[in-house]
């Protein structure tokens, strides 16, 4: 609707959806953590494989529910799409875009947002003035539109300043990690193919693969906060997922083009912040627009921006200021009457069942989707730091507490994460690096398209209270870090941070197991504005 005369061929990598497949992936190696109920499901699937669409340790679902179908949709590289949109906007002469300009904070004066302040430049890593120091510029405006995503510093500061609406929370998260790859020449997948998976490498991890023209594919996994594991290593899990026989038959012989990761806000409408206030409005994923039933967020985020634009034009024509009252009428009312709101309400409780377990979650999603939100499976959410057990509890009966302590001490001495040793100990195979598609995490940083962090800026990942880190025996921030930018300190205290490796995914923020104060739902890690770390233009 925004581009009624759009020719998809103008956008690099765009292609209409042609075919959809959903696979339930069984564990081919026996290392996956599966409940008793899921083991029964797996046994039945293998026992009845002669009558099921079973192949390569996977069952293809014969029916895809309407709420999961992507037909009539368009496969896009968001990076390429954003560049294309940016060119359209700049070409209009009405908009300026300042890429690579980190915004430090909102300017809040007497309860009203007057604009934003850019980060200081010419500082040391602690933010102290250094050579070429220049304080951050203040940019003032009648209306500040905040669309900096779920872990953006401006949006999070507004949440702290004004609070979330009563009854709302932001407890469900996921880290999405993906690659763009060149498929092997003999790959049989056609452009427009959409593949979704669930069940492996751990039951809670969902996967996807989208095939673009010229044998290029985007593929990846989502690791959710309700996966109650202290070993949330997205990169290693991504490699195990790719090597599942049902997928490896398409990928073997391919090569990585680019790689990246980002945090997703999975609370849906219940994570909606205050959408407007005097001088500001919220749009996009950080405004609670993601549909947690269909797992879609791009169309919804885009539409929130369109709705705000319509409201702003209305107020401008009427000569009215951008007050909370006026924005409520012009924007929020439009949003409440939109398809985003309607479908978001239907989906609001879709994932509550996952609070009870994986199978309960699948049943709950099915009930919500098939009844359009009338029937839901209830579940009680918890803050992320209240969900994660200790390593000793998680591996009880498999690895002794003494051995875990030895592995932990060795990892601290080597400045590495402990997940590789733990996963090997419980039966996960080593990754057979091939230098093309299966790369070490550090090699992926080098060839995956990451933008390096320039000097002259303060570190953007900050451990607020050292004592909390020193008393933490489960440094999940190290295990989950997408770029291995957070590593163990020699003394086992405050982790070390190397911003050259940071991909700005924000996973450390919601994986911190130490609340910054009693009763707080926020951890001890603060994610501030910073330069560099962005993904390649196609990822």
Place the predicted regions along the sequence by residue.
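FAD-binding beta-loop-beta segment adjacent to the flavin cofactor pocket
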Residues: 261-292, 444-456, 467-480, 487
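C-terminal catalytic lobe of FAD-dependent flavoproteins
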Residues: 220, 228-254, 270-304, 309-315, ...
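Predominantly flavin-linked oxidoreductase catalytic cores and closely associated redox partners
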Residues: 77-249, 307
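Active-site-proximal substrate-binding core of FAD-dependent oxidoreductases
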Residues: 288-294, 306, 310-361, 496-498, ...
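Helix-loop-beta segment of a Rossmann-like dinucleotide-binding subdomain
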Residues: 51-82, 87, 222-224
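C-terminal auxiliary extensions adjacent to catalytic cores
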Residues: 354-431
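N-terminal FAD cofactor-binding segment of flavoenzymes
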Residues: 1-52
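Iron-sulfur cluster-binding cysteine motifs and their immediate structural context
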Residues: 472-500, 507-537
